[in-house]
Amino acid sequence: MPPSKAEKRGLTLEKLASYDDVITDALVDKIYYWATIRKNRGTRFTASRGLQEEDIAGVIREQVIWDKDPVEAVQQLLDLPGLRKYMKGLRDEKDQDQFKRHLRRYVNIYMPDCPFEVTTTNRYTITDHEASITARRDINPREEIKYLTGVQVAMTEEQEKTLELARKDFSLVISSRKKTRSLFLGPARFANHDCDANARLSTKGYDGMQIVAVKPINEGDEITVSYGDDYFGDNNEECLCHTCEDRQQNGWAPMKRVEDSDDEDMEEAESPVENPSEATSSGTATSGGKRARDITEEDAGADLPPTSKRARIEKKPSPTKARASDHLREATLKKVHSTSSLRREMPVSSIEDPSANINVTSPQMTQDIRNQQRDGLLTVSLDETSSSRESTPQSPLMAASPKSSHSTDATSVDDEHHVDSLPKIKVEPEVVHENPALGVATVKEEVITTTVNAPWPSPPAEDDEMSDLSELSDSMEFDSVKQQIVKRKFRPTLRTTRSKSRYEVHNRVGTPVSSAVGQDGEWVENPRKPGDYMTSSSLLSAKFSKWVECQTCDVQFVQQDGYNTRKECPRCERHSKLYGYAWPKTEREGKHDKEERITDHRIVHRFVDPDEERELKRGKTKKILKESIRERFSTPRSGRESMSASVEVDSGRKRRRVRKTM
């Protein structure tokens, strides 16, 4: 009899994600864990109410730690109400076997010979604790870290969106052999990234994963692997690992680049559709906009030589392109009007030939034209057929001039004036030339020829180099409400650099502070500082939260609701509840070891003695602890300040002052 389709099916993505969520909730979150493991299905996962903390911890303690029988532990765990109900939902026998194998991977991490322990770290989000792996003993290079394994399943982008893994991609790996993206789950997924990792991921079998040490790992060190060169942005520029913190690079760099947002796309998305029928006939706005952006990016990526002649338009533009050009002309006219008539008052005589000595306009006529221009009586007429992409070659000096980006208003006189007998002036606004070498996309030039009916006769216009344009001073501006020129108001600007006297000393240690502005964005101060996950005041936001030093591992931690001070950190306290020994001990170390295992964790007093508690409340120990944390996680800025202070002590001025007092 041929096998059915159900028997042919293997481990799928949805099944593995569901198995891992249920097992991590049962065997990690509900065993004295002080945080919550991030689930693969996000908000769609609901914890089982049939799993109690003491029931699961009792099975792990008796069957795994004391008797070292993980097989019996798996069977007893499946007899608990929550897991028994979940197993009944798996009707296929093969699915039940896969769930048992995945459950066994998590049961093994509580074996006494397991060299690691699942802990947490707040390095990445400061206020939220995420899972991590800490070594419980010394690990040699090229040693397979026992029980730190996982399983992978190939996936597609559609499945990734279905499981809402876009923001939870820390369990996604790309196989260098198969060149496919896979979902990687199991105890090994708790290993975080480091640019100088002490371990690596390797395949084992068909779909298995194993972590192997590449460097000596000491007891208490975090076990890390490398996720890739571009996992956290380009060249891992957003990485917050321990190595980047020591080197003050990537996510820990003193200065951070600000990426420019696409304001035009946002305005286009927010603007309503004027003609729904046209939008429907031409396709959806999203798809059309995406195609347009793709074409733009493709054109911008090509290396275009500086063109001296503009390409002629030989084909009639399509309706879509015509609408785009209409929006472009509206934006151009708005920009021209805002940058010429209001900001820069230009006398009429400035566009005339100075050498011609022709005085055909009186001051009264000039004033009338300006008043009509400001009151909106002068209208703009565009000739659709006169649009051209042809222009004369421009000199590099004119292209680089900042004045070339501004142009005069294209205006025409209303019906009160005789426009038939008046000459016509063609005004071609200048186009800003971008330097392709500065990383800016080269845009093809496009000029819209505008016909201006001037109310006065004028000789033929000459080159721009011969015209003398007068403009307002930088300290003056035109007030559109009062219709007069007023003094420009001071607008404070954000400082992106430090003063010279400060950063010269600061550059002696650490990464130099750049005072330049990047070509594709500004540099601002990075909000993340080295050690801020230990020194941040947001950690003590609760009323009775405080810093406490663990009496077992000498690590500082924040105790929430610290009415009474605890002796141990959450990691050491969880370890002692399970194994009955102080961290990192899991069993007797030989026949000469006479220390008894504590089988009932409830008999252990978890808080400090009353005398020590009184000392802590006086504030002396608390102040010393804060100073030690500040010195341990001091930023390079504080180190530089201490260096500058030491230089001042050794200076001659200081020595002379000492000699005078003596």
UniProtKB/Swiss-Prot annotation:
It catalyses: L-lysyl(20)-[histone H4] + 3 S-adenosyl-L-methionine = N(6),N(6),N(6)-trimethyl-L-lysyl(20)-[histone H4] + 3 S-adenosyl-L-homocysteine + 3 H(+). Residues 260-271 have a biased composition (Acidic residues). One of its GO terms (biological process) is methylation. Residues 252-418, 627-662 are annotated as: Disordered. Residues 356-370, 382-395, 402-411 have a biased composition (Polar residues). The keyword Chloroplast does not apply. This is Histone-lysine N-methyltransferase SET9. It comes from Phaeosphaeria nodorum (strain SN15 / ATCC MYA-4574 / FGSC 10173). The gene is SET9.
